[in-house]
């Protein structure tokens, strides 16, 4: 299982890198598109579609595998109180995985409302999963000191992701207020792949990329968890 986690994380990181550099090498503005913006440009959309399809396809079986190994661990460690959190964590990340596959074929400039719904399911599901996984690892460390390092590392990545989420929210709010609508002319700007036109939007995009990297970090802690549970 730990090998599958490594493969999933590597694919996710490679996808982000290839999407960004394909965007830049095509002459687009380097600072900074939203991740989904790279799906609007033929030079980078192929990497977005292939990479996130594979990421989502690996996320779903991993959610099932981690649910099962954690369930078995809980059965052997009565009183750990992770059963409900384990189920909710598995469901939330599985839904995110399904939405990641779906959004790979839903460019936002073609199906805006559907794309935004998918994005909220992805990020909402990943936030729930990261928080619950962090609490689960804390409960594990309370029963078995070997999980202490895992708990600390996972907590650090989760906190980093939440800080990035806060930065994303503040940046978007400073530009658009409470409105969730896309600013007029923004689509044309993205399709021309030039500067987003406002520092707050580029800063929000930077926080989005950073948050996704943070989630990849949380995912990678699954390698250590799988090894510890198997021991």
Q: What are the functions of these language-model segments?
A:
Residues 71-83, 111, 142-153:
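Membrane-interface helix-boundary motifs at transmembrane edges
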Residues 187-192:
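Surface-exposed intrinsically disordered loops and tails
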Residues 1-72, 83-108, 120-139, 156-183, ...:
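Early transmembrane alpha-helices of polytopic membrane proteins
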Residues 110-117:
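Interfacial helix-loop-helix junctions of multi-pass membrane proteins
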């Amino acid at each position: 299982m730990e090998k599958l986690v490594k493969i999933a994380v590597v694919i996710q990181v490679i996808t982000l890198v290839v999407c960004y550099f394909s965007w830049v090498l095509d002459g687009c503005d380097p600072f900074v598109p939203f991740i989904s913006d790279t799906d609007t440009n033929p030079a980078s959309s192929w990497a977005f579609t292939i990479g996130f399809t594979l990421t989502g396809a690996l996320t779903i079986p991993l959610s099932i595998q981690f649910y099962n190994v954690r369930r078995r661990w809980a059965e052997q460690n009565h009183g750990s109180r992770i059963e409900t959190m384990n189920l909710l964590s598995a469901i939330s990340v599985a839904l995110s995985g399904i939405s990641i596959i779906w959004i790979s074929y839903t460019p936002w400039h073609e199906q805006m409302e559907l794309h935004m719904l998918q994005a909220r399911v992805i990020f909402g599901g990943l936030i729930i999963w990261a928080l619950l996984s962090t609490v689960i690892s804390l409960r594990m460390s309370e029963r078995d000191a070997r999980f202490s390092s895992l708990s600390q590392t996972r907590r650090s990545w989760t906190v980093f992701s939440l800080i990035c989420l806060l930065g994303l929210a503040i940046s978007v709010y400073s530009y658009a207020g409470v409105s969730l609508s896309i600013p007029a002319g923004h689509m044309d700007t993205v399709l021309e792949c030039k500067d987003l036109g406002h520092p707050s939007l580029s800063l929000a995009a930077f926080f989005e990329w950073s948050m996704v990297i943070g989630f990849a970090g949380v995912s990678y802690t699954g390698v250590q968890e799988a090894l510890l549970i198997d021991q």
